Amino acid sequence: AHLHHEPTERRPCRYECPSSRDPLAVDTQTEATSSNMRELPGALAGPRVVTLGGTEDPLAIDRNEMLRYLGHTGQNIEDDLACRIERVARDVEAHGRARGVFATFPVDASTLDDEGRACIRLTGTVVTLRGRDIYRHLKDARWCTVLACTLGMDNERRLRALGAQSPLDAAIYDAASSALIESAVGHLDSMVQDAASAAGLSCNWRFSCGYGDCPLEAQGRLLASLDATRRIGLTVTPTNRMVPSKSCLLYTSPSPRDRS
C-alpha cells in the first residue's frame, strides 16, 4: 500500500446554545472536543489517501467469496468453467486497483435531531447519524473513523466492455470485482486497526449506512466529510447509490483498550 497524508483544514466547532446560557460560562463540550483532537493519534486523524493493489502489489480475491457472488451453493463446477473463473479472477487481481481514504472525527452523542431523538454527530462535519443501532454503536465513543474505498471507473468501463463481448465473462468479472473491493476494504480497515493498536487503542466492529436502522441518506455527507469525490472519485446519487458501483463506505470507533 502506498500512503500519503493530506493536511486537514480544522474548522471551528459550532454549538447552538440556549439564549439563557451565561455568555461567560465555559463551553465544556468544545473543551472536550479540543481535548479529544489533541489526544487523537496523528496516524488516525487523516484524511489519509491510500492506493491498494496493482501489478506490483496485487490484492488477493477470496475465491469462496467470489463464488458466493456468482450464486454458487456447493454444486459441482465443470473444469472448463472453473478454468474460466480462475482466469478472470487472476486478471482482476493483476490489474484491479483500489483507492481509499479515511479520517477520524470526535463523536458528539449529547444532542438531539430535529425530531427530538438522540443522534450521533461528527464534530467538524455536517454529519448526523440517526437510528437506534448506530447510536448504541457510537454513543460511548470518543472518535469515529470514516473509511471509503472504490475500484474506480476503469473497473466500470472494463465491465461494460466485457458485457458487450461475453456476458458470462462479464458476470464472472463482476463477481470477482465485488470480492476485490471486499479485500481492499479489509486492507484499509487493517491499516486503521494497526494505527489504533500502535496508540494503545482498539477498534470496534465495522458499521455502514443501511445496517440496522441507520439510513442510507447519511452516505452523501459522510463522503463529503472525507472530500471523497475529489480525493478518490467516489460520489453518491440522489437515490443513495454509490458511483462507481464497486465502492464501500463504513465507519468504526477507535477506543482505549480498557474501555468497558
Predicted regions and their residues:
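Solvent-exposed alpha-helices and their adjacent loops that cap or buttress functional pockets
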Residues: 137-141, 225-226, 243
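Active-site helix-to-loop segments that bind/position phosphate- or nucleotide-bearing substrates
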Residues: 36-173
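TRNA-recognition modules of translation machinery and tRNA-sensing kinases, especially anticodon-binding
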Residues: 248
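Low-complexity, intrinsically disordered segments with a bias for serine/threonine
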Residues: 23-24, 259
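Internal, well-folded beta-alpha domain core
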Residues: 166-227
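Short linear motifs in low-complexity or flexible loops
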Residues: 7-8, 12, 19, 25-33
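Conserved small/polar residues in nucleotide/adenosyl-binding loops
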Residues: 251-258
